[in-house]
Amino acid sequence: MKKLVLFIMILCLVLLVGCGLQDEAPTTQAITTTTEEVTAMNTDLGYEQISGAQAKNIMDTESDYVIIDARTTEEFNEGHIEGAILIPEYEITERAEAEIPQKDQLILVYCRSGRRSKIAAEALVDLGYTNVKEFGGIIDWEYDIVRS
C-alpha cells in the first residue's frame, strides 16, 4: 500500500513539474512592413502616400506639378505652401476637372492633419486622375509657408 501511495505521489509530482515548465516565455511577434509594401498598399487606393520631405523634394526638382490645399479658406489664409491652390476637400468633385484638366498631371495634396487630404486624394482618383500623391498635413510641414 505504501508503495502505491508513493508511486501516485511521484506520478503527481512529475505531472505537476512537467505541466509547470515552458521552454520559453511567450513572445510578441514583431510586425515589420517594408517601404515597398506600404507603397503597394497605398497604390491599391489609387494614390501614393508620401512624406513631407518627399513632397518637398518633388517641389524642388520637378516643374510640372499642382499642389492642392484641401483645407478651408480660413485655414488657407492663415498659411499655406507656396504655389498651392485652394480646393477644399468638400469641393474636389465639383472643381477638380476645371482646375486640373489633365488626368495624368502630378498632383500633390495636403490639408491640416492628413484626414481631408486622404479624402481629396481618393476623390481625385475616383475622377480618373492617375498621378496623385498625398503627403498629410501642414502641421507636420517643416518648410516655409506663405502667410496671407
Where would I find each of the regions flagged by the language model?
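Short, polar loop motifs at secondary-structure junctions
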Residues: 70-75
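Rhodanese-like catalytic fold shared by cysteine-dependent sulfurtransferases
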Residues: 4-8, 15-53, 58, 65, ...
